[in-house]
């Protein structure tokens, strides 16, 4: 038999398979969710801020020093993912104002150069509104003038 020809030993009639049972209805009780494993780890941005504050460097802390501090002081961190997580955290911190670049690394971009903790974004204090005294209802004078 040539390899290009199909084998004809199969039956050409298409017999229907036995009827399937109708689809199972949704469960009445919802599935139980897995319990979360203990306390959540701090965000990468909060770890970066803590590292910069602990180093107390006036001119800002380098990315390498921040990474070294985070790995030394935080257990259970995936070292292979820390670099990309730090890049995202630096971008988020710069955008929100939590982190700023010192003048020495103003031209740097991405996760390079030095970073400092920015000044806390001071929310403008809203002036307390004075309680308005309820206005007296003015009584409408009915005009008794007749229209001529």
UniProtKB/Swiss-Prot annotation:
Residue stretches of biased makeup (Basic residues): 1-35, 124-148
Coiled coil: none
InterPro entries per UniProt: H1/H5, Histone_H1/H5_H15, WH-like_DNA-bd_sf, WH_DNA-bd_sf
Domain H15, residue spans: 40-119
Origin species: Mytilus californianus (California mussel)
Main subcellular location: nucleus
CDD domains according to UniProt: H15
Endpoints of the signal sequence: none
This protein's name: Sperm-specific protein PHI-2B
DNA-binding is among the record's keywords: yes
GO CC terms, sorted: nucleosome; nucleus
Function summary: Linker histones are implicated in chromatin remodeling and/or transcriptional regulation during spermiogenesis, the process of spermatid maturation into spermatozoa.
Protein's cellular compartments: Nucleus; Chromosome
GO-annotated molecular function: DNA binding; structural constituent of chromatin
